[in-house]
Structure formats: structure tokens, C-alpha cells
From Swiss-Prot:
Superkingdom classification of source: Bacteria
Any single Gene Ontology cellular-component annotation: cytoplasm
Gene that encodes it: hemC
InterPro entries, alphabetized: HemC, Porphobilin_deaminase_N, Porphobilinogen_deaminase_C, Porphobilinogen_deaminase_C_sf
Organism: Streptococcus sanguinis (strain SK36)
Protein name: Porphobilinogen deaminase
Amino acid sequence: MKVIKVGTRKSKLAMTQTQQLVDQLKALHPERDFVLVPYTTKGDRLTHVSLQEIGGKGVFVKEIERALLAGEINMAVHSLKDMPAKLAEGCALGAISQREDVRDCLIFRQAGQTLADLPKGSLIGTSSIRRQVQLQAQRPDLAFKPLRGNIDTRIKKLEEGEYDAIVLAMAGLKRLGWLDQSRLHIQPLETSLCLPAISQGALAVECREEDEELLSLLAAVQDEKTAAEVAVERAVLAQMNADCTFPIAAFAQKNGQGYQLEAMLAKEDGQCIFVSLQGQDGQQLAEQAVRQLADKGAVGMPWLKK
């Protein structure tokens, strides 16, 4: 396998972060040639519709997985937060690279503002219910309006006055070099204020599970700490039978005592349920988190397993 075809979404962010990961592989395996193969997924095509309305799991990965299984490509690079807990049959996670900044951030139209001092009724752009409910818990007087599209489009809409502030992931801004541009007025949101999406900031390489040669090659870019932490978070996702469109969050940190896990679920009335646990066994910790969320009022939520 001299030439390795790498599937990715067509967006500027997806292409950039895929190229960054490929550059790591190329440095370790200079004898290999890597070719990026871009795809437009269902989630990319239907930008005028909310992800909740599109529905289903893997709206940003299904087309790429089909291409992988059909042999059109050898591997694919995804934002792990977009991937369902259960992969398509025949696919495997070949590597999870070192995690970027997990935090969300607010970007303001006017300089000098923070979440605390935004004027009452300010309009915030986000299509993420997870982000909205956590910000509303801090500022119930704010208004929210859906916002989808690539990062450049979202920032342009902010600067043109459609929103007073927008919410984006720090990881994407860093990978695209936006933080080097002084014109942005950014407030990073600490995880104590806004828990991130499950696996936010992590990239995953997917390949066919029988491709032992490629699996061996990909081991070089695996970050074991990141892989262990996101495995706990994705266990929460699996236990909830949910996907990236649902208002859930989880953030696991590996430490000397095992794992610290924070998880959040938004109820249908917008109330946020939080749990915080410490334990040695990540899988058991995820199961405990889901049980505690249920005990606190998540019973009967439509996406939880019966």
C-alpha cells in the first residue's frame, strides 16, 4: 500500500485538521504517499436544517464510512465528537490523536464584553442545545438563534451584525489559526461553566478492521491518554443511546486516582442535570454517571435506553 487515500469532509476545518494529522503520519512514514479525498456529508448539505431535524446518528460520517467499506479510500479522519458510539460494521478506530483544547468559547461582536456583562436580550448564535442550555443557566435573559455553516461563515454573520455573540469550539479556531487574528473578541468558556461535547477536540482515524497493515501504521499517532479519556466519555454516549445532536456533555480526565468524570444532560424543560464522579474503572464510571443522571430526573428521556 504505497498510496494511502484519506477520506475527509470538504470543509476548510476538516481538510486542515486532516492534513495536519497526515503530516504527522508522513513525518513518521516518509515512504508513504497520502492523498486527501473530500466528501460532502448529509450534515454538510443540509445547513438550513437543524441537526435535530436531520436526525439519525453519524450525519457527518456515514457517506465517508460507506466509501471506506467500498474500498474507495483506505482511511478517514473525523472529529471524534461527530462519530456515533457504535461504528459501522467492518470499521475500526485506528488511532485517536492528542486532544486539542476541549473548551467552547464566546466570540463577541464588540470588544471588551464577557458573558457576564452582555446586555439583556443579546442574541447568541448556536445550533447546539447543549451549549444553549448551559449558557441560559448562567444568563436566562439572553436570546438564542440557530447558527450553522463553516467557521468562516459563522464569524462573517457575527461581524455583519446578525448576532451579538456566537459560540464555537476552541479546537477548530486553533487549528485554523483564527486565534492569531486580533480582530476576534474571544472569551474561552471553562469546563466548569460549559461542559464540552463528548470527545470534543479529539480527532479519530477510522479504517477497515481487517486492514492490519494500516492499523499498525496508525499506532504511531495514537495518544493513549486522550484515547483512554474519550473512551470513558463515549461509554456515556453509548449508555445513553444518544448521538452528537443530543443535549449531553461529558468530560473525563485521567489522573493518579483513575478518572474524574463530569457529565451533563439537559431535560426537555431546559434544566441541566450535572453529575461529577471519580473512579478507577472508566466503563463503570460511565455507567454510574448515567444511573445518577436518571436518578436526578432523566428517566423517560426519549434517547435513553429502556
